[in-house]
Amino acid sequence: MIASPDRTPLPREFFDRPVLEVAPDLLGRILVRTGPDGPITLRLTEVEAYDGQNDPGSHAYRGRTPRNEVMFGPPGHVYVYFTYGMWFCMNLVCGPEGRSSAVLLRAGEIIDGAELARTRRLSARNDKELAKGPARLATALGVDRALNGTDACTSQETPLRILTGTPVPGDQVRNGPRTGVAGEGGVHPWRYWVADDPTVSPYRAHVPRKRRS
């Protein structure tokens, strides 16, 4: 059987480009998460670009560590990190190996497997909120550290794959500052989203944490 065009895995060459090219081009692409409970399919509607050691907002800004090792590897692999002691977030590595650039997957529309996603996101008021925000997206898809380093652009059956989908036309793509990024990194307009899409998360500027007295 010939695969339909929108379900063809994205080639590694897609990710082997500058992060500011890859990030907006990921909008409309399809993410398939396959786990023991069943598959969930999601259409990406919001992402953020992080340009490695050149970017103060990036985990790789201060160099290679055990935590960010995957960011320095081949493009097209999954980088998962744990944040605030509670949530996982998922990125796709891009650019040439060693560049350490990645795209944070911020939001998407669940197009298949919503029933399973609802069991993981009990606080969601409706299906548009199931993957509205990076931690919610990861929770809905059942993402954890076990996915860190997964090759997402392969034709093989893996726990997570990124497929061609339907790219969003340029006139429907918006961009602005990244959510919650402080300092110099906060001025870059490297957050990209689908205009007027109800699954896109609201922008929030960085708010310094108050120290306990």
Swiss-Prot record:
User: What are its E.C. numbers?
Assistant: 3.2.2.-
Keyword Lyase present in the record's keywords: the answer is no
Q: Which domain of life is it from?
A: Bacteria
Q: Which InterPro entries match?
A: Formyl_transferase-like_C_sf, MPG, MPG_sf
Q: Which keywords are on file for this protein? A: DNA damage, DNA repair, Hydrolase
Q: Which GO terms describe its molecular function?
A: alkylbase DNA N-glycosylase activity; DNA binding
Per the database entry, which stretches of residues form a coiled coil?
A: none
Q: Which GO terms describe its biological process?
A: base-excision repair
Of which family is this protein a member? Belongs to the DNA glycosylase MPG family.
Mind telling me what this protein is named?
A: Putative 3-methyladenine DNA glycosylase
